[in-house]
Amino acid sequence: MEENMNDMHGEETPRTDLTLFSEKMQELKSRIASVIVGQERTVDLVLTAILANGHVLIEGVPGVAKTLLARLTARLIDADFSRVQFTPDLMPSDVLGTTVFNMKTNEFDFHRGPVFANIILVDEINRAPAKTQSALFEVMEERQASIDGTTYRMGGLYTILATQNPVEQEGTYKLPEAQLDRFLMKITMDYPSLDEEINILERHHTNAALVKLEEIQPVITREELLSLRRLTEKVFVDRTLLQYIALIAQQTRTSKAVYLGASPRASVAMLQASKAYALLQGRDFVTPEDIKFCLLYTSDAADD
């Protein structure tokens, strides 16, 4: 019996939709590049995660534009943004929100925490106690929060960008494997190159780096982004590439050089990321190179 590969692994994407998507993504990347010097790889990976409906763990020292990248991206895609700084004394209610009695109405009002946004920047996630981390990871996994018997669901556009300092720094703790598995990708933001740093200095010297985010106009609306994101479901993946992903995962589980093999969740993450990354490159089909590229970041998140 002949199998319909399009039905199994993706449908044909109309060229008009693909062209519109490519134009929007190129404009988005261009606008980010006009504000942030370098970090093109990081920008591609963050956009890939958003398109794949996943979360990102970003490791890097302070001062490499992690916060600016998150705020700017949210602004350009017309998304609600929030930020929470994780500290050793942070409580779950500081992240999720809390119920407060309103004496005027004689009722309890729920005050939403920072997790109720579209793009959430969680700074220094590896400085918070385990209980607070667990509250966040439950929301990441379930995309909903249960507070005082009421369940609050997150919107369709929901990506957490969590940053962590290198574990060698004082007061940091290595995240457990089960928690790393909640991230689609792990990215390391490097220092700028010499030429990039000179460019940064020139921008600051001439005040060209002074950008008011509130004055920046979105490139795309949330509704448009969600509509275009559905194109990832139509990206074609040949059966041989599915076998390729499965083979990679199997080999990590038998190799003595790997501490903990890739889980099935990691295999799915690799597939989702590869489809989104292919679309970001203007293609409606996945290549082996897409998988090899995404492997560097999806496997690191799941099996660090």
Predicted feature descriptions by range:
Residues E142-V219, S227-T232, K275-Y277:
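Canonical AAA+ ATPase core
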Residues Y297-D304:
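Conserved small/polar residues in nucleotide/adenosyl-binding loops
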Residues A52-F86:
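Walker A/P-loop
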Residues A117-M140, Y173-E177, L194-I198:
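Conserved AAA+/SF3 P-loop NTPase catalytic/coupling segment centered on the Walker-B
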Residues S22-H55:
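Pre-Walker A (pre-P-loop) alpha-helix and adjacent loop at the N terminus of AAA/AAA+ ATPase modules
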Residues E2, N6-R31:
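Conserved ASCE P-loop NTPase core motifs with emphasis on AAA+ ATPases
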Residues Q250-A257, A269-V286, S299:
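AAA+ ATPase "lid" subdomain C-terminal helix
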Residues N102-I120:
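Conserved alpha-helical scaffold flanking the Walker A/P-loop in AAA+ ATPase domains
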